[in-house]
Amino acid sequence: MKVLSLIFVIFSVLVLFASAKDPVCDQPKAVGRCFAAFPKFYFNSSSAQGEAFFYGGCGGNENNFNTLEECNAKCA
């Protein structure tokens, strides 16, 4: 019985850590304070998917990815 309880606890912890989302993914879209127009992607936590936007080139936050694949791999 103790072994079964231990296995359950270990499994629960693994599931919890595997499903934990990176806090970067909850940051809002931030175009930055400069005026360039670099095509980038951010994770929209409301729609639960990566979306395109134009990054100004400076400032912003970490929810800023070069490709949709990179965005979804980190956050979806």
Curated annotation (Swiss-Prot):
Gene Ontology MF: a single term: toxin activity
Keyword Disulfide bond included in the entry's annotation: yes
Signal sequence range: 1-20
Expression tissues: Expressed in salivary glands.
Pfam families per the UniProt record, alphabetical: Kunitz_BPTI
Keyword Signal set for record: yes
Cellular compartments annotated: Secreted
Protein role: Potent anticoagulant protein that inhibits the hydrolytic activities of all serine proteases tested (trypsin, thrombin, elastase, and chymotrypsin), with the highest efficacy on thrombin.
PANTHER family in the record: KUNITZ-TYPE PROTEASE INHIBITOR-RELATED, SERINE PEPTIDASE INHIBITOR, KUNITZ TYPE, 3
Protein name per the record: Tabkunin 4
Species of origin: Tabanus yao (Horsefly)
